[in-house]
Amino acid sequence: VTTDSALLRFGTDRALVRAQVVRTSHATSVELEITRGKMNRVRINRANPVRARDILGIVRTVLFAPEDLALVKGDPSARRRFLDDLLVVLQPHQAATRSDYDRVLRQRNALLKSARAAGKLTTNHEATLDVWDQHLAQAGARVLRGRLDVLGQVAGPLAAAYASLTDGSKLASAHYRSTIVSDIEDDGDAAVQPDGNSEALLEASASELQERILAALTAKRQQEVERGMTLVGPHRDELLLTLGGVPAKGYASHGETWSLALSLRLASYQAMLEDDSRPGAGPILILDDVFAELDADRRARLAKVVADAEQVLVTAAVEADVPDSLKGHVLRVTPGAIHAAGEGPGA
C-alpha cells in the first residue's frame, strides 16, 4: 500500500482518527484526517493543523508484520528504511534532515543527468555540482552519524532477542557498510561479504563525516556523470545482517529469517525503552498477524518475550493462533463493525 487511501472505508472519501494518548502522566489528544487525494491533516490538542511529521514521537509504536521478512530477504532499501524509521523515533529532528537529503539528492541527480545528456561536464555544471555536493555532504553526514548511533543502540539487543527466540546456537549481528568507504551496489551484492566497514567511522563527528562524503563525491564525479546518478552517500549504504557469521540474506532458513526479522523489531523496542525508561513511556507493541507465520515453539518464545510490555495489540485471522498468555481484551472485527468478544454477530 503506497497511500493512506486504502485505510478509507470503500465508498467514502474521508476519515477521522482520534486518539487520547497517555505517556507517563501526560495526556495528549491527536486527530488525523485522511482525505482521498489530499495531504493528511493533523491536529494536536485541538490546535490548528500541523505537519504530519510533528506527531512523531507522541505515540511510539513497534509494528511486527508479515512484511518484515523484507528486512532480511529484501533489497538494501528496506534495511536502510528500518534504521531511518527508528532514528526518527529516537531523534525526531532527523525527519527534517532526511527530507533535506532526499530533496538535495533529487536536484543533484537531475544535474548529473543533464551533464550526461550534454555529453560533457561544463563549467556551469561543475560550479553547480560543487554547491550541491556541499549540501548533500552536510545532510548526509547527519543521516550517517544518526544511523551509526542507532546501530550502536540495537546491536546488543538484536543478539539478545535472537537468542531468546531460538536455541541460541547462532549469534545474530548487524554491520554497516558505507559507500564513502567502499562501493556498494543497490542490488544487495555486498551482502555476500558479512563484515561491515564502518569501524573507521564510528568515532567520527558529523563534520568529519561531511569531509569524507565530499571526498568520495569528488572521487566519483566522472563516474557519476557517465551514469547520471549519485553513487555515494547514505542512500546507497547497506545494513548487513549475519547469523553465526554468515550473511542472513540468501542463507538463512525461513524460520531463521522470521526470527531475525522479529529480533530487529524487538531490538528497536528495547532501544526505545532505553531512550525513555519512565513508567508509562514504553512503546506500544503491535503484532499484526505474525503468529500464523510461526511454529508453536516460536509462538511461545515470542509471547514470553513481549509479555512484560506495557501495551500489546495483536491481530489474527484465527484466534487459536494467539498464545493464551496474550489474550486479554478481545475484539472481533466483522464487515463494517467491531465488537467485544461475546457481543455482536456470532456471539
What are these regions (language model features)?
Residues A19, Q311-A317:
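Structural recognition of the conserved hydrophobic beta-strand(s) that form the central parallel beta-sheet
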Residues K120-I284, E293-D297, R301-K304, D308-A309, ...:
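Conserved NTPase motor "head" modules and their coupling/switch loops across ABC/AAA+ ATPases, GTPases
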